[in-house]
From Swiss-Prot:
Pfam families: PD40 (PF07676), TolB_N (PF04052). Keywords: Cell cycle, Cell division, Periplasm, Signal. This is Tol-Pal system protein TolB. The Tol-Pal system is composed of five core proteins: the inner membrane proteins TolA, TolQ and TolR, the periplasmic protein TolB and the outer membrane protein Pal. They form a network linking the inner and outer membranes and the peptidoglycan layer. SUPFAM superfamilies: TolB, N-terminal domain, Tricorn protease N-terminal domain. Gene3D superfamilies: TolB, C-terminal domain, TolB, N-terminal domain. It is found in: Periplasm. It comes from Blochmanniella floridana. Residues 1-22 form the signal peptide.
């Protein structure tokens, strides 16, 4: 299947939504000075396209690519205002000139019209050689509505060429949006990873929580209180049909799809205490995994689909434990940072996890490297960092954090937001997995919680 066939299919999926919202914008907070410098030159175009660009009728391809590369934390894209000149073709590039700027990689591109379609072409150029060498190039003929997706696709190709790691710029995220809408205060939304193309999947006057993607990106599991108590929903995105409803007495929550897509882990308190369970999605059979009087919740799968990380307070305060679903006696603690540790999220390759660490009145996102045993704090400057979700390639992670809208905030004051519940704004934040690069996704008029990143297979 070509990327444009996939693009068309996903476009159909999202068009089932009745509600769409304004896009969010990424605001860099710090970290780009430590990244590899690269120049993305504005794409050349003919007069008709220039007119449309100036009137915001088509996407600025170069700006999207530059933002993608910068958001990864791996690259520092030189702002257009600082470009001393803008080459339009390979022969315009003077390697020694770019070398003096500390830049050895340049992206050139062009946009042209062919019939009613757009032709996007680009070159990735190595300026460390003299003469400069083209190390990657490609061309796409697309409809106008696919411009943004094509820009993300180019970013993926460039990122993989330069790092050897698959890009995630065509993936989607899901999250819960809370607004002051009297009728529908809670909304389950999806968007591009960068907050664009935001779409509402479900709206409710009662709380929605904990969305989780299926590995193929076709379904979302989430928690709803629409009936008056918590229920687990599995919803197909193509037609909005409800496939499964888990509604035992008391609490039903924290869904997590197994990487093989065959099982759903979740927590129930139907017997009084909160324990972990697994549903076989082909038979709907439910297996109890933990059985004790403590709180056991927030499961996250290891890549083998046989082991879970989860939060338990069996030691007195919440900590992260690991358990094999076929041997529930094999449970052991794996988090050791001071304070409490909870809400684990395992990387897709199983080499590390991120979690929420609470210590001395502060709340951070921390990382545990399973290969070295090293634990480190990634968001020391965030307020109430929560619910981390790792990108499919393990390079970035997303989390919710709080903007304190008062002059006593020790971090920063942001007055751009309105309709802020409880005077504070919960926003989406994006960070590199080493914690050196951070950005906020601004632009929503509500509080955003429970972000979750789709897999690499879930794109347009």
């Amino acid at each position: 299947m070509t990327i444009f066939q996939k693009s068309f299919i996903l476009l159909i999926i999202w068009n089932f939504s009745l509600f769409a919202f304004s896009d969010m914008k990424i605001e860099i907070t710090h970290g780009i000075n430590t990244a590899h410098p690269i120049a993305v030159i504005p794409f050349i175009n003919n007069e008709n396209i220039t007119h449309e660009l100036n009137n915001d009728n088509i996407e600025d391809i170069a700006s999207i690519i530059a933002a993608d590369l910068r958001n990864s934390g791996k690259f520092n894209t030189l702002p257009i205002a600082y470009l001393p000149y803008q080459p339009s073709k390979l022969t315009d590039i003077i390697p020694t000139f770019w070398e003096k700027l500390g830049i050895n990689t340049v992206v050139l591109g062009a946009i042209n019209i062919k019939n009613e379609n757009y032709v996007i072409s680009y070159q990735l150029i190595d300026t460390s050689n003299n003469p400069a060498l083209v190390i990657l190039d490609n061309q796409y003929e697309i409809e106008k509505k696919h411009l943004r997706y094509t820009a993300h696709t180019i970013s993926d190709e460039i990122f993989e060429k330069l790092t050897g790691i698959k890009g995630v710029f065509c993936t989607r995220i899901a999250y819960i949006l809370y607004t002051n809408n009297i009728k529908y205060a809670y909304e389950l939304c999806t968007s591009d990873y960068d907050g664009h193309n935001q779409v509402s999947i479900c709206r409710s006057s009662e709380p929605l929580m904990s969305p989780a993607w299926s590995p193929d990106g076709k379904k979302l599991a989430y928690v709803t209180f629409a009936s008056g108590h918590s229920e687990l929903i599995i919803q197909t995105l193509t037609n909005r049909s409800i496939d499964n409803i888990i509604q035992f007495p008391n609490h039903n929550g924290a869904p997590a799809w197994s990487p093989d897509g065959k099982k759903l882990a979740f927590s129930l308190s139907k017997t009084g205490s909160l324990n972990l369970y697994i549903m076989d999605l082909s038979s709907n059979n439910i297996q109890q995994i933990t059985s004790n009087r403590y709180n056991n919740t927030e499961p996250s799968w290891f890549p083998d689909s046989q082991n879970l990380a989860y939060t338990s307070d069996q030691g007195g305060v919440p900590q992260v434990y690991k358990i094999n679903i076929n041997n529930n006696r094999d449970s052991h603690r794996i988090s050791w940072l001071n304070g409490s540790n909870q809400k684990p999220n395992i990387s897709m390759d199983g080499t590390f996890m991120v979690m929420v660490n609470r210590n001395k009145g502060k709340q951070y996102i921390s990382k545990l490297n399973f290969l070295t045993g090293e634990e480190e704090t990634l968001t020391a400057d965030s307020v109430l960092a929560d619910t981390p979700s790792i990108s499919p390639n393990g390079i970035m992670f997303m989390y919710s954090s709080i903007i304190l809208n008062n002059s006593s905030s020790e971090l920063y004051l942001d007055k751009k937001f309105t309709n802020i519940p409880d005077n504070n704004q919960s926003i989406l934040s994006l960070a590199s997995i080493d914690g050196k690069f951070k950005a906020h996704l601004n632009g929503s008029t509500g509080s955003i919680r429970f972000p979750t990143w789709s897999s690499l297979s879930c794109s347009y």
